[in-house]
């Protein structure tokens, strides 16, 4: 199963919080982080199966419309990111989010019951 990366860039923090909430509620994805870009731009990043990430991004985009002044600036999905990206960009599963990955996918890291 390919683990995809999905991103939504919004204008304003409330919009990205709304997008992130909708994304993790709509599909079996894990929120791996967000990035403050500057000038009010914020990007939220999820990981999961390609079809789940697609559904997640679609839900996030739709829900940003609920935020007064919320605006989606860009979206993108990478179906199978090269492993080098995980070491350079903030898209990897961290220890802090691993518990959520387990609940979404049923995957348990080695050495954990």
UniProtKB/Swiss-Prot annotation:
The keyword Transcription does not apply. Disulfide bonds: none annotated. GO terms for biological process: carbon fixation; photosynthesis. PROSITE patterns: BMC_1, BMC_2. One of its GO terms (molecular function) is identical protein binding. Keywords: Bacterial microcompartment, Carbon dioxide fixation, Carboxysome, Photosynthesis. It is found in: Carboxysome. Residues 4-90 form the BMC domain. One of its GO terms (cellular component) is carboxysome. It comes from the Bacteria. The tight homohexamer forms a small pore which is positively charged. One of the shell proteins of the carboxysome, a polyhedral inclusion where RuBisCO (ribulose bisphosphate carboxylase, rbcL-rbcS) is sequestered. Assembles into hexamers which make sheets that form the facets of the polyhedral carboxysome. The hexamer central pore probably regulates metabolite flux. Belongs to the bacterial microcompartments protein family. CcmK subfamily. This is Carboxysome shell protein CcmK1. It comes from Thermosynechococcus vestitus (strain NIES-2133 / IAM M-273 / BP-1). The gene is ccmK1.
